[in-house]
Amino acid sequence: MHFEKLKEMEYQDKTNEQRTIRVLMSGGGTGGHIFPAVAIANEIKSRFPNAEFLFVGANGKMEMEKVPQAGFRIEGLNIAGFDRGNLLKNIGLPFKIISSLWKARKIIKNFKPDFAVGTGGFASGPALYVASSLGVPIFVQEQNSILGKTNQFLGRRAKAVFMGYPNISSFLPAVFTGNPIRENIVTDIINTKEAKEKMGLDPNKLTILSVGGSLGSKTLNNAWREFLPKLKEKNIQLVWQTGKLEYQNIISQCGSDEQGIQIKEFISDMALAYSAANVIVSRAGAIAISELAVVGKPILLVPFPYAAEDHQTKNAMALVEKNAAKMVKDSEMNEKFWNTLMEICEDENLRKEMSSNLKFFAKPNAAKEIVDEIFKILKTK
């Protein structure tokens, strides 16, 4: 039924503005799962303004707040992941899974989607499994360089698995599209010197941008506490995003902004900050790397070592193997961090080579490519 309806759409006299399709979206738990789902939905909506969307999330998780803020309807399942740290918390998990499957079945039968897209997270497992069981075509988007457990399971049922990285097992219908990123990262990047001037920095001095996410990175923050005096001696500028948890402590310890050193709790205009940087230090989350690849600045990655299946290290290694980035482990945030950073800062040819190699991973139109593939696949079935 779903394929036939989409094939009919190709030949109807109606314009896209008049057509109505129903799309089930599921992804959440972290921003890295939520943002791609919203970006894909927005791309579909730009082509089919009358399209109806329903997101399925996990109750109590951030998608229940973020998705409505993005303008989409969402229903929640009482589902959670397996807790490796406290096994007793998993006693009720089988009952939650069964309950979620039943609720997902009810949601999908009522909504009657034409197809479903999952971007990972607790709720996408039951939502897309049930959709597939009911004959709804499903598509999976994987942000990391390795498939998460949920997407491994769903990938075998999917019409396509859209990969953020090119290296994925051949037994799945994988398509390398890259990860959807914020549109302004593509459109608002400006000349480096101009960006430095806008940020009140010396346009002629090399500038490092350090980003650790909205909560910040304790590892990166501790490193800058240690190496800030050496950085000043080198006459290198630093834009240091601390995150909200440690901002006040860092300000009291290191002082407020001084010439060439900007300490910020949060950076609202990331496109401007990226533009101003000559070198970027970052964790190795999938969406962060996708943005950095499009920005094309030399990067030093410090993977978060406790990410599921150590996927941040695998993300970073995908770039390191192409000489598109340097990596320092969390346990190596000592002189090795400093020496690696200075190797990048003091070698202009190396910086140019890293920037050039990053282009292999840059996919500024990932959401468009994903939606193109979805409709190409549906119309040929």
Question: Residue locations for each model-derived region?
Answer:
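Donor-nucleotide binding loops and adjacent catalytic segments primarily
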Residues: K61-M62, K66, A70, I190-I280, ...
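Active-site-proximal region of nucleotide-activated glycan assembly enzymes
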Residues: R22, E52, M62, R73, ...
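Conserved nucleotide-sugar phosphate-binding/catalytic loop shared by glycosyltransferases and other
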Residues: I21-G28, R47-F95, G212, E246, ...
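A short, well-ordered alpha-helix in the C-terminal region of glycosyltransferases
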Residues: L350-P364
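Acidic donor-binding loop of glycosyltransferase active sites
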Residues: P113-F115, S275-S290, K297-P298
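C-terminal alpha-helical cap of glycosyltransferases
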Residues: H2-F3, E10, P364-K381
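An amphipathic, basic-hydrophobic alpha-helix
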Residues: N86-F115
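N-terminal subdomain of nucleotide-sugar transferases
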Residues: H2-G57
